């Protein structure tokens, strides 16, 4: 029996966020789920906390804060997207090995690695001169 387009639209409406509050609630649930279930998110959170503490201790400039916070939020965002991609791939592949599934997961993890490299480089550029000055002056 062919599916009626109206039935499909009605079922889509049931799941569509109707208010800003419900959209925000779903988004926050996703963020909390990522922190609760993903081991790497906890590591990123600890790294972010240490970077913020270092920024406060070394009294970084406004521009340095912008780059520091950009790095932190980019890493967390990419990790959430990576986790979402991994979940969708696992769902679609029903946990069976597929080279396409592996490639998708590897590429998503690679994106996190690239942005983490950017964050590490940003941290080095900001903090190494300050630590150097502290140690040798």
From Swiss-Prot:
Reaction catalysed by this enzyme: di-trans,octa-cis-undecaprenol + ATP = di-trans,octa-cis-undecaprenyl phosphate + ADP + H(+)
State where the protein is found.
Cell membrane
Q: How does it sit in the membrane?
A: Multi-pass membrane protein
Gene3D superfamilies the record matches = 1.10.287.3610
Q: What happens when the gene is disrupted?
A: Cells lacking this gene display defective growth at low pH, elevated temperatures, and high osmolarity. Moreover, they exhibit a significant reduction in the transcription level of mutA and a defect in production of the lantibiotic mutacin II. They also show reduced resistance to bacitracin.
**Membrane-spanning residues:** 43-58, 62-78, 109-129
Identify the PROSITE patterns for this entry. Answer: DAGK_PROKAR
Q: Might you name a Gene Ontology BP term for this protein?
A: phospholipid biosynthetic process
Task: Give the main EC class.
Answer: transferase
The EC number of this protein is 2.7.1.66
Molecular function, one GO term: ATP binding
Would the keyword Manganese be found if you checked this record's keyword annotation?
no
What's the domain of life for this entry? Answer: Bacteria
Which UniProt keywords are given for this protein, alphabetically ordered?
ATP-binding, Cell membrane, Kinase, Lipid biosynthesis, Lipid metabolism, Membrane, Nucleotide-binding, Phospholipid biosynthesis, Phospholipid metabolism, Stress response, Transferase, Transmembrane, Transmembrane helix
Membrane topology, Cytoplasmic segments? 1-42, 79-108
The Gene Ontology CC terms held by the record are: plasma membrane
What's the stated role of this polypeptide?
Catalyzes the phosphorylation of undecaprenol, which is probably the primary physiological substrate. Is also able to phosphorylate diacylglycerol, albeit with very low efficiency. May play a role in adaptability to environmental stress conditions such as acid tolerance, elevated temperatures and high osmolarity.
Q: Which family does it belong to?
A: Belongs to the bacterial diacylglycerol kinase family.
Q: What is this protein called?
A: Undecaprenol kinase
Q: Report the source organism.
A: Streptococcus mutans serotype c (strain ATCC 700610 / UA159)
Gene that specifies this protein: dgkA
């Amino acid at each position: 029996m062919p599916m009626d387009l109206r039935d499909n639209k009605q079922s889509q409406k049931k799941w569509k966020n109707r208010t800003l509050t419900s959209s925000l609630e779903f988004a926050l649930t996703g963020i909390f789920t990522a922190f609760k279930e993903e081991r790497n998110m906890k590591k990123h959170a600890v790294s972010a906390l240490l970077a913020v503490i270092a920024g406060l201790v070394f009294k970084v400039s406004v521009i340095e804060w912008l780059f520091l916070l950009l790095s932190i939020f980019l890493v967390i965002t990419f990790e959430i997207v990576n986790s979402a991609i991994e979940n969708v791939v696992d769902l679609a592949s029903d946990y069976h090995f597929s080279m396409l599934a592996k490639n998708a997961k590897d590429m998503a993890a690679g994106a996190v690695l690239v942005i983490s490299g950017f964050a590490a480089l940003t941290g080095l550029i900001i903090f190494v001169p300050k630590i150097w000055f502290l140690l040798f002056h």
